[in-house]
Amino acid sequence: MTQRKTAFLVAAAMTATMGLAACSGGSASNGASDGSGVKVTWNMWAGSTDDEKWVADTADIVRSQNPDIELDTQTSSWGDYFTKLTANASSGNLACVTSMNGQRLSGFHQTLSPLSDEDLKKAGIDKSAFADGALDILSYDGKVYGVPYDVAAMMVYYNRDMLAETGTPEPAADWTFDDFVATAKGATTDAHKGFAVGMGEFQWMALPIAKSGVQPVDPSSTLQLTDPAFVEAAEWYADLVLKEKVADPVPSASEAGWGEDQYSNGNVAMAVDGTWNAVGYFTNDAGFKAGATRLPSGDKGSLGLVLGSGFGIAANCEGAERDAALKVLGSLVSKEAQDLIGSSGRSFPALKASQPAYFESLDESIRDDIKAAFEAAFSDTVGQNSTAKWTQVNEYFTPNLVSVYSGAMPMSEMLSQAQAQFGN
């Protein structure tokens, strides 16, 4: 997913860089077998002053719940976080508590320690207390590698003013792909298009996945970009630009947030993006009235994916340090910490009991609309299948999507080339 201002929660730090090893400052010989008297470091990505306040407040919750554990925090910007994580992983030098984005887990799962039911029990974590599919976010090959702090789903956002101006009905929660095309056509005029295509992984793939009922990766973590149903749906998506003329081509690969930016600036009637940007869109600076609803459905229903980020335990974290890290993990996703996330309106908590706090934090003028959109968007979501080469696949897509949208490269060719390059 494109990481924008509120893309999944970001955190703060006592230091400006990720620094050295996280599990330093304490060892099995220095702490009790239950993890008390040990120093633990929590590593997170950070992007703003607000993010820093969130991590500081969250760290205070952890410390208050675990006064016998010394907690340090380290952060880096989103852009640098995974680069530095790769470097630290190669030396076996990860923070005991390492934050992880679900879409990137496949490339880092070997650096994290699988969490057993006994581990979760030690951490005080009840799996049944989390939203449906939430534990799938940080699971890989049947093993749980982390616990999520938020959940997200993709939605179609629309400009209510633009639809009213063109006499186009607003989407209903049970709309179909035929309805989607009709809405895009109805809202397309000489002055603006009815839709803006995406460049980010799920900003563009969400509709083909929903239409085909097929994920680009199968349950065995095998890339299946040339699955006939997925290819057909992806070609339909490209044709929104090439044949239906309801969307403009993307000018260049540097326009990584093309669809989202076109929508938020009031230039188009619809775009696809995640629930994490709902508040920003509903309070947009362009001044239009926003709406949102679930992805449309087709002959195979409407397959949506539950996405998010969370926290894991590094594989190099052992003994008393690991026991202490499990306690920290439990506190990071405790109701108190999840209520903090929800009440700030920053992200939608993974813990079911804390989700009402998110809606209560919203202004009354947008609360009911966002709540209805979320309820629809999360109604049929499943966990994302992923592969170790998923990041490389999406890096390949970015420049080539520009060629697809311009008509210089067929969508089927882009998918087949990616399958040939990354499918083995």
What are the functions of these language-model segments?
Residues 184, 222-251:
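Glycine-centered hinge/linker elements that transmit conformational signals in sensory
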Residues 61-129, 165-167, 262, 269-270, ...:
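Extracytoplasmic "Venus flytrap"/periplasmic binding protein-like
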Residues 95-96, 123-162, 193-194, 291, ...:
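A structural signal for short loop-to-beta-strand junctions that line the ligand-binding cleft
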Residues 64, 166, 242-244, 283-347, ...:
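Extracytoplasmic/periplasmic substrate-recognition and gating elements
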Residues 116-130, 173, 194-195, 214-233, ...:
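Short, solvent-exposed loop/beta-turn-alpha elements that line the ligand-binding surface or hinge
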Residues 368-419:
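C-terminal capping/gating helix-and-loop segments adjacent to ligand/active sites or protein-protein/ligand interfaces
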Residues 1-40, 64, 416, 420-424:
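Short, low-complexity disordered leader/linker segments with a strong preference
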Residues 107-116, 134-170, 198-220, 306-314, ...:
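Periplasmic solute-binding protein
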